[in-house]
Amino acid sequence: MTANVDGVPGKFATLGLTYDDVLLLPGPSDMAPDEIDTASYVSKNVRVNIPLLSAAMDKVTESRMAIAMARQGGVGVLHRNLSIEDQANQVDLVKRSESGMVTDPITIHPDATLGEADALCAKFRISGVPVTDGNKKLLGIVTNRDMAFETDRSRQVREVMTPMPLVTGKVGISGPDAMELLRRHKIEKLPLVDDDGVLKGLITVKDFVKAEKYPNAAKDGEGRLLVGAAVGVAGDAFERAQALIEAGVDFIVVDTAHGHSRLVGDMVAKIKSNSSGVDVIGGNVATRDGAKALVDAGCDGIKVGVGPGSICTTRVVAGVGVPQVTAIYEAALAAKEAGVPVIGDGGLQYSGDIAKALVAGADTVMLGSLLAGCEESPGELMFINGKQFKSYRGMGSLGAMQTRGDRKSFSKDRYFQEGVASDEQLVPEGIEGQVPYRGPLSSVVHQLVGGLRQSMFYVGGRTVPELQANGRFVRITSAGLKESHPHDIQMTVEAPNYSRQ
């Protein structure tokens, strides 16, 4: 940013603007809102159908939220306040939730017990498991129907499974042909085998049903839902990244409160040099120089935002930050030159703020408080005075950084406090609270994307790049902000996409 205000050089940077300081100017439009394409890029190689990410926070994104986000066309970023094993398992759950073909299906040995088969089905939320020998040769299949009336859970799978020969398909079978086999034989699972009878994949009828139900889902090249995951810069960060990549994650986010740090650049470079095919995103930054440093480190995406979140206190505890519209604009100036997408992280209150972030230079936005109240978020549901709320907290809050019994916090190094000896010495940069319960994610996303489509229609942008090119801001006063909200009326019924904050 230029160190100049009203022609006076010195320590003062440019004027900082945030979402409430600006509006978008309407422009000529030749399309209807339903003709608009909201697809965009999270990173150089990860494309989503709606420009929304759920935040890597322990009250926002675990596997259930990530699955729901990808089905709506966005993507979830799994938080890292988990053990390495747990976070990798979360990635696996998302990847196995649906696919065109399961290339590495869960299997069970014929000598396993029915109790073990039950536990496996419960863990992965599946209704049946192929039975294979030690060489992965298909021996049969065991399903819920096979086990339903078996009271002795110590019996072996081989005693109740449906043995070969089964209806199977060859590797490379087309979708329509697979669907025809499932329909003709009235089965739910179609194992795919090679000429030697070795199991190579699995197609289920549920995947076809889900594909029809969620036509806008964001998927990888194998038809699996997209998912990202966060890592830090200290301790087990590199080991964690390797485990996540092995589990099938689509991108890694090196997630810290201060991305303009040598430690972040070093970790990005280390992950990039030791893995291929997985994009690495760095953050968070709020300046042009910070974004350029991450570009130089090899980032495939840049996350922008220092202190804009509703639960963040960095700007008052540390006195550091940049209002979010200006932060995105400045970071994008460095990122766009290198073809690196920008993620606007935090500070969004309404659907209109999404469009403002995109016009400022973001390619996608990351949402925390707007999604924390959803049914799929991992926050605790509570009732207060007859109303429903869900717990929400910053990853820099005491609750997120403290050790609870045997549960270790993996969040401290996000704020570079991993070396703090005791919880009493932590310096929090966030708070804990609750947000109103908002129902299923699908309803919330419908309103957010609907608002974005209206913004693109008003501005005159058929695609996100067109919105970015055509969008222009007008700065407003406090009176202009007051005029922008409903006024001179007592609101009796809240709209699903508006409440006075």
Identify the role of each PLM range.
Residues D34, I84-D92, E150-S154, S174, ...:
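Active-site-adjacent beta->alpha loops and helix N-cap segments on the catalytic face
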Residues R64-I67, E239-L244, A286-V304, G344, ...:
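Catalytic cores of alpha/beta
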Residues R71-D86, D195, V249-S261, D300-A318, ...:
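Glycine-rich phosphate-binding active-site loops on the catalytic face of alpha/beta enzymes
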Residues R80-K95, V131, N135-T151, L182, ...:
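Terminal amphipathic helices with adjacent charged low-complexity linkers/tails
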Residues V77-N81, T107-I108, G128-P130, T168-K170, ...:
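Catalytic beta/alpha-barrel core
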Residues D34-V48, A55-M57, D86-I126, V131-D133, ...:
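Bateman/CBS regulatory modules and CBS-like beta-alpha motifs in cytosolic regions of diverse proteins
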Residues M1-P28, I108-H109, K170, D177-E180, ...:
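Alpha/beta catalytic cores of nucleotide-metabolism and tRNA/nucleoside-modifying enzymes
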Residues R47-S54, G100-P105, M164, D220-A230, ...:
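Short beta-strand/loop segments at the ligand-binding rim of alpha/beta enzyme cores
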